[in-house]
């Protein structure tokens, strides 16, 4: 029911030319200690309880954006979990909108980028430098591979 209601709201709002942002993806159960919570959940419960509503909205209403939660799921930061943001959200469900992290949620900007986090807030100078260094290393590796060394 939640997914149906949310899909109807997203569709109605976006029909008027206004983008929507679903939050807090996923397993966000509490605002207290939200940056330290590690939700332990089985794959079945994750899919049938925590992700089902989001999946319904993504497939039915195509929201413009989605915000990840602060918490961890089974030890993985949601904002850096490739399986949740890339494999399930983008690849399996076909989400083609913008994925944004909650303010300061990204601990590892490279992993977040691999997981298809499109907007990291805020992007600190140290995070930008870290990303630049990682990109430099990838370019060097690609160059070496292309020349066969």
Predicted regions and their residues:
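Glycoside hydrolase catalytic-domain context in secreted enzymes
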Residues: 1-149
């Amino acid at each position: 029911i939640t997914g149906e209601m949310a899909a109807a709201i997203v569709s109605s709002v976006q029909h008027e030319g206004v983008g929507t942002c679903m939050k807090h993806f996923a397993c966000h159960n509490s605002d207290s200690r939200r940056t330290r919570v590690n939700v332990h959940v089985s794959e079945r419960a994750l899919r049938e309880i925590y992700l089902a509503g989001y999946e319904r909205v993504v497939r039915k209403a195509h929201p413009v954006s989605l915000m990840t939660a602060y918490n961890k799921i089974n030890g993985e930061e949601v904002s850096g979990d490739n399986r949740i943001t890339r494999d399930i959200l983008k690849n399996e469900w076909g989400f083609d909108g913008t994925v944004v992290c909650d303010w300061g949620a990204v601990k590892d900007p490279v992993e977040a980028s691999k997981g298809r986090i499109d907007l990291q807030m805020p992007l600190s100078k140290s995070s930008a430098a870290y990303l630049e260094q990682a990109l430099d290393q990838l370019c060097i590796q690609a160059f070496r591979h292309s020349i066969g060394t």
